[in-house]
Amino acid sequence: MRWQDQGIVIAIRKYGDDQIIISIFTQKHGLKKGLAKYSKKATHRLQIGDYVNVTWSSRLISNLGCFKYELIKSTLYHYIQDNLKTMCIAFSTVILDQVLPENEENYIIYNCLDIFINSIQFQDINWKIKYLRLELTLLSELGFGLDLSRCAVNNTNENLTFISPKTGKAVSKTVGLPYSKSLLPLPQLLYDVYNNYEYKYSKTDFKLSLNVLGYFFKKHFLTEKNTILIKYREEIIKLIDLRD
């Protein structure tokens, strides 16, 4: 079994003295893991977020297999000096590595990850919007999508103020106010991003949106064993608070 593709490196683990296990999210073959040779003398050490051309080979598709790769571009320089960007890259790549099924193409998630990473590379002032869209898309593609288009009870699309923590659906102010203590707030920014509206936002809007999305990630994916993901999520919120 042998194929070639292009992808984004989302995890690297050392394996022995001269090998690494790489997780690459590819365009046509989805998430794939494989062994690759590691050399301290290499001109470029593979990093999270690198774009690579890869050749994967194995006797069976279910086997770990081996990678040969060629660097297309490195994005490390564009995020490593910004702790918030680094943590967002870290959280998104780790959770993709943990929850995506192998050998299943998902161009929708791949495209969102690609747009997010490129927004950082090209210093897009709206990179945070691209990140929220990535998280919304990941939840949706894995079967836990939010529905922020209209109220789940009366079907109105006006005054959507809350989100049901059970269903992930929006609830209008009129319907939800008596039950506000048991509902999640619906941040205006998250509503705008979901519905592809124009947006203006502050760090508070970004933080509130991440808190809501974080609730659903914890509900569906993050257990007590996912200490690294929980740590990354907490660090993202702390870093937002430190911003001017």
Curated annotation (Swiss-Prot):
The keyword DNA damage applies. It comes from the Bacteria. The keyword rRNA-binding does not apply. Transmembrane segments: none annotated. InterPro entries: ARFGAP/RecO, DNA_rep/recomb_RecO_N, NA-bd_OB-fold, RecO, RecO_C. Keywords: DNA damage, DNA recombination, DNA repair. It holds the Pfam family RecO_N. GO terms for cellular component: bacterial nucleoid. One of its GO terms (biological process) is DNA recombination. HAMAP family: RecO (MF_00201). Belongs to the RecO family. Involved in DNA repair and RecF pathway recombination. This is DNA repair protein RecO. It comes from Ehrlichia chaffeensis (strain ATCC CRL-10679 / Arkansas). The gene is recO.
